[in-house]
């Protein structure tokens, strides 16, 4: 069975997210710091009749970076064109996209840290001075062509801001750090989703689901669908606190939001390495997961919740991890 808390998007989930996606900042729940900053920057850009400065949105998967990009475009009243780093394989691909932009348009590049360097270098002049120089022809006929671009706003999204080159990062005038959601905001998101899809859910059930959704709206919405299934088959359709707890326990999602993979990480650290320190590569091999998957998807939440610590010599399981899994903790 696929991991219920996996943040990899599937086609049906993309359709669900489009249905749930807020259109404007006032509809966007959570991320208040980012929203308040953007509201000022957007209003100022509109008053000056200028394109908004380029913006970089970064943070763990599933926190609404794509949604925020579309909200920004709506607030500006402009079109948005969407692509992703892995799709743009060569400079010519990017040139074609840039050449199709209208004045003020938003270009959204997801996973921008995965742009090839040759493509990234084309962006430098495009972002800074709104032009690109490209080489056409070959051999003796090879020549440089200068193309002016309309003012536009590039919005980049990444889960790994540290992988962006310094020259690219420096060209973003706006940065927004998307953080894990507070329980109250996530509860509101769960209740909003339930209302849109006409699910019958109690406030206590929404709170319980929010508490166990790793501070991530995408996970909360995914779990809500599975709890709804459970309520329809094992109950009378009402999603209450008892049904929610039973459904999430069946899915191996505990009261801290940890699933079997998270628990496997912690148990491996404790049972095989005495709680650590253990290197990320070694840990990844032992749990049969890719290093990047552990680093991007599991580790941030485990650190944020205080279950593991990063040290110079490796990852270390904390007292909280021992106690949560029922192990005796001994000071080292």
Swiss-Prot record:
GO terms for cellular component: cytoplasm; Holliday junction resolvase complex. Its main location: cytoplasm. It is found in: Cytoplasm. It comes from the Bacteria. Residues 255-332 are annotated as: Head domain (RuvB-H). Residues 1-181 are annotated as: Large ATPase domain (RuvB-L). ATP binds at residues 20-21, 62, 65-67, 128-130, 171, 181, 218. This is Holliday junction branch migration complex subunit RuvB. It comes from Streptococcus gordonii (strain Challis / ATCC 35105 / BCRC 15272 / CH1 / DL1 / V288). The lineage of its organism: Bacteria, Bacillati, Bacillota, Bacilli, Lactobacillales.
């Amino acid at each position: 069975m696929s991991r219920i808390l996996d943040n990899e998007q599937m086609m049906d989930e993309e359709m669900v997210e489009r249905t749930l996606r807020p259109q404007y900042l006032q509809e966007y729940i959570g991320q208040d710091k980012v929203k308040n900053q953007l509201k000022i920057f957007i209003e100022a850009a509109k008053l000056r009749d200028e394109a908004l400065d380029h913006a970089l949105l970064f943070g763990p998967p599933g926190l609404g970076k794509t949604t925020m990009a579309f909200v920004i475009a709506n607030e500006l009243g402009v079109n948005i064109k969407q692509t992703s780093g892995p799709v743009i394989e060569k400079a010519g691909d990017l040139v074609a996209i840039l050449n199709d932009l209208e004045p003020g348009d938003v270009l959204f590049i997801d996973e921008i840290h995965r742009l090839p360097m040759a493509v990234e270098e084309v962006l430098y002049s495009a972002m800074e001075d709104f032009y690109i120089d490209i080489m056409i022809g070959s051999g003796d006929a090879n020549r440089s062509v200068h193309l002016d671009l309309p003012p536009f706003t590039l919005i980049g999204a990444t889960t790994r801001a540290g992988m962006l080159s310094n020259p690219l990062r420096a060209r973003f005038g706006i940065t927004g750090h998307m953080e894990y959601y507070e329980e109250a905001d996530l509860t509101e998101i769960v209740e909003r989703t339930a209302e849109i899809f006409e699910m019958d859910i109690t406030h206590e059930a929404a709170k319980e689901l929010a508490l166990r959704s790793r501070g991530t709206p995408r996970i909360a919405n995914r779990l809500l669908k599975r709890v709804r299934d459970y309520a329809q088959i094992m109950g009378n359709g009402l999603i209450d606190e008892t049904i929610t707890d039973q459904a999430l326990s069946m899915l191996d999602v505990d009261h801290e939001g940890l699933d079997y993979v998270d628990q496997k990480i912690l148990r491996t650290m404790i049972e095989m390495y005495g709680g650590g320190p253990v290197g990320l590569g070694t840990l990844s091999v032992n749990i049969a997961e890719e290093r990047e998957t552990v680093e991007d998807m599991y580790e941030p939440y485990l650190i944020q919740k205080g279950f593991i610590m990063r040290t110079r010599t490796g990852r270390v399981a904390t007292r909280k991890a021992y106690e949560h899994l029922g192990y005796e903790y001994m000071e080292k």
